[in-house]
Amino acid sequence: MTADDSDEPTADEIVEVASDAAEGLILSRYKQSEVTDMDVTVRFEDGTLDVDIYLNAPDDPDPGAVAQEAVEAAESAVDELFE
C-alpha cells in the first residue's frame, strides 16, 4: 500500500456517504412521519456504486421522482469524495 492509497475513501466510507445523502434528500422532501416505508441499499464493489431505493410515501411530491433524485444525490456525494 502506498501513501496515495490511504488517501482514497474506503468502501465503507463510500457506502455511508451515499446512504446518508440519499436518506437526507428523501427526508428533505417529506416529513419523517409521512414516510410509511423507506429502504436505501448501497453497495460499492470493484469501483461500481449501486444504489437501490424503495420509498413508500405520499404522492406529492412523486415518490419515484424523489427516489431518483436521492440516487443522484448519493452519486454526487460519492463523486465529491474523490475530488
Curated annotation (Swiss-Prot):
Domain of life: Archaea
Family: Belongs to the UPF0440 family.
Family matches, as Pfam families: DUF3194
Protein name: Uncharacterized protein NP_0614A
Biological source species: Natronomonas pharaonis (strain ATCC 35678 / DSM 2160 / CIP 103997 / JCM 8858 / NBRC 14720 / NCIMB 2260 / Gabara) (Halobacterium pharaonis)
Gene3D superfamilies in the record: MTH677-like
SUPFAM superfamilies: Hypothetical protein MTH677
